[in-house]
Design a protein with these regions (language model features):
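Beta-propeller fold detector
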Residues: 19-33, 78-84, 124-130
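Blade-level signature of beta-propeller repeat domains, shared across WD40, Kelch, NHL, RCC1
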Residues: 135-175
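Loop/turn-rich, solvent-exposed surfaces of beta-rich toroidal or solenoidal domains
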Residues: 44-67, 83-120
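Short loop/turn segments immediately following beta-strands, especially the blade-tip
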Residues: 12-20, 70-75, 116-121, 169-175
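A short loop-to-beta-strand structural motif that recurs across blades of beta-propeller domains
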Residues: 7-10, 64-68, 111-114, 155, ...
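Conserved blade-ending motifs and adjacent loop-strand segments that build the rim/top face
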Residues: 37-38, 81-95, 123-147
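Residue-level signature of beta-propeller blades and closely related beta-rich strand-turn architectures
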Residues: 5, 14, 59-60, 72, ...
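Surface-exposed, proline-anchored Ser/Thr-rich loop/turn motifs
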Residues: 45, 181-201
């Protein structure tokens, strides 16, 4: 869990918690990082190896907004500053690529950026903005389910400031088509029910 004060906590034992009493006795909370670089805005865990973790931080004026560790499960993980050649800008969201764990994609004040090797001595970031221009990217999530469980396995979804939601397709971010304002010409289903219905109690 990341905080606005730049602290990162690791919570262990959640799989054994079923009641408040369990939480009091079975949870372990460890402070594993204090960034000093602004609030933690994003946390990405490698879907293939949960000892690999990357975080993003907000705020201007500092070149330490992206951190990475390969020993997140250790008692005292070592986080490296992987801000690299990025401009000193806020980083709002972050993902470790499911299919290439050395690739990290970030959402920034100025759009989408990526590195092909987060473990490099000097990390180089590339501009991935293409059609969605240099707009703040506040949310980013990759579908981690395998193709046998999800047809969109590996697709990255991003939420922008003012330009809507986008999805990745062959490394190019394209907009998801919007619904037209015209009524559907398909047959109306009058007895269609959705459960549970949050409107009815």
């Amino acid at each position: 869990v990341g905080t606005q004060q730049g602290r990162l906590f690791r919570i262990s034992g959640l799989s054994d918690v079923y009641t408040q009493e369990d939480a009091d006795s079975k949870l372990t909370v460890d402070l594993i990082l204090t960034t000093g670089a602004g609030g933690i805005t994003g946390i990405a865990v490698d879907a293939n190896d949960n000892s690999r973790l990357a975080i993003s931080c907000g705020g201007y004026g500092s070149a330490d907004r992206v951190r990475f560790t390969e020993n997140a499960l250790a008692a005292t993980p070592v986080f490296n500053n992987v801000h690299g050649d990025l401009v000193e800008m806020p980083i709002y969201s972050i993902e470790i690529n499911l299919n290439d764990p050395n690739m990290v994609v970030i959402g920034t004040e100025f759009g989408i950026w990526a590195t092909s090797d987060i473990t490099a001595t000097s990390v180089t970031w590339s501009d991935e903005n293409d059609d969605n221009s240099y707009i703040p990217i506040y949310a980013m999530k990759q579908q981690h389910l395998p193709r046998s469980e999800a047809s969109n396995s590996g697709v990255v979804y991003v939420g922008s400031f003012g330009r809507g939601f986008w999805e990745s397709t062959d490394e190019l971010f394209v907009g998801t088509p919007e619904f037209a304002n015209t009524p559907s010409t398909e047959k109306f289903i009058s007895d269609f029910k959705v459960f549970p219905n949050p409107i009815q109690t």
